[in-house]
Regions:
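Short coil-to-helix segment of the ABC ATPase nucleotide-binding domain corresponding to the Q-loop/switch region
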Residues: 17-24
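Hydrophobic anchor residue at the start of the ABC signature
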Residues: 71
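Conserved signature/switch motifs of ABC ATPase nucleotide-binding domains
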Residues: 56-59, 77
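Conserved H-loop
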Residues: 111-117
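Catalytic Walker B motif of ABC-type/P-loop ATPase nucleotide-binding domains
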Residues: 82-85
Length: 171
């Protein structure tokens, strides 16, 4: 529904469209005013660090850039809830770290509820306020942990948090 946004493991972009056209896709389907939407597209491209790439075909982008397009495409629609299914799993370490910081920044600035699915314990600790460990078959919540590290990540560099004794012992 329109109250939910989704960011998949792979960008799930329309390769035949440009970056701007991909970001604008949801608004176009809602038949929003094109003059107003282009301004929003440009704003979101700047937020995700892709200013100047609007006319670039998405197949020419790196994996990290494609994920940022997917994130902007989700967020431009202003969903109440953002579902992220391993969106950073296929990225190299440096790009992944940048994207983790970006997700925290967007969370802080928008106040959106984000449900992030990841197999990376470190990523879950860094980005989550709460961590749910799932039990196998049937899938159900096995354990819940409340975490302080996402709030810390809004103030400190993520690399510094990883050096924190509490982070290390929790991990």
């Amino acid at each position: 529904g329109v109250d939910r946004g989704m960011v998949f493991q792979q960008g799930a972009l329309f390769e035949w469209l440009t970056v701007s056209e991909n970001v604008n896709f949801g608004l176009r389907m809602k038949k929003k005013d094109s003059g107003e939407t282009q301004k929003k597209v440009d704003e979101w491209l700047e937020i995700v660090g892709l200013k100047g790439f609007g006319n670039t075909p998405t197949y020419q982008l790196s994996g990290g850039m494609q994920q940022r397009v997917a994130l902007a495409r989700c967020l431009i629609n202003d969903p109440d809830l953002i579902l992220m299914d391993e969106p950073l799993g296929a990225l190299d370490a440096l790009t992944r770290e940048k994207m983790q910081s970006l997700v925290l920044k967007i969370w802080k600035e928008t106040g959106k509820t984000i449900i992030l699915i990841t197999h990376s314990v470190e990523e879950a600790l860094l980005l989550g306020e709460r961590l749910y460990v799932m039990a196998p078959r049937p899938g159900r919540i096995h354990k819940e942990y409340k975490l302080p590290f996402a709030e810390m990540g809004l103030k400190e560099d993520l690399r510094e948090i990883k050096k924190n004794k509490e982070f290390s012992s929790t991990r």
